[in-house]
Amino acid sequence: VIRENDALIFFNFREDSMRQIVEAFVGKEFNIFGKKELNNLYVASLTQYIENASLHVAFPIPEIKDGLAEVLSKNSKKQYHIAETEKYAHVTYFFNCLKNMPFDGETDFLSKSLKNPLENPEMRTDEIVGKVLSELDRYDFFVINFANGDTLSHFGNLEIAVKGIQAIDKAVGKIKSAVLERGGTMIVTSDHGNAESLTYRSSGESETRHNDNPVPFYLIGEEFERHRSDDDIASTMKQSSGLLADIAPTILELMGI
């Protein structure tokens, strides 16, 4: 269908979902599968999927300075970013403000996702936890992504999603215990809802998309511990305050930066 002298426009704005196919057209060293070279092919994209001179970008990426990872690096803090394949870009490229290369003092670890998460709803939680616990004394800051809740919720299967969340619950519990033993502080949060709402109330159909439900922000540390009744906790969970933009400054304050 695509011939020489054609123009090819990619209009999806999600880099992590588009860079693979775009690389097949503009990557000089692409060798994942055989392809026919097309002369004078004009390839354009809505946003910057990859850094390649052959890709014409309609809206270049604005430079974002002093993101959390960059500020930690400037303050000589060692940081560890870990996720499985499904969410690796979220703890690297996206977390680092659309920068592909790690900052000084940053280590990235990728745990390869299993082929069928429906048959393995625990996904890579065990490997991620094991790696974090083994590295806990070597770094000042960790950003850890557990993909189960998001990935499994897209299938709309409540039973499978519950198993995935249970795996996360166990994993977070192990990390929490290790962090508190060392006198550290831990934050548990998310950037969107999904697993908590898998059915549309109006129709009863499966709800498999992200939603804008309020997400929790749990601040865990001995200095923040206080007794609260079940009613207090339930009341707090119904309130919505704060923004995702508040998290990075909160972390920097906790770290004395």
Question: Across the structure, where does each feature detected by a protein language model lie?
Answer:
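Feature captures the catalytic ectodomains and active-site-proximal regions of enzymes
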Residues: 1-257
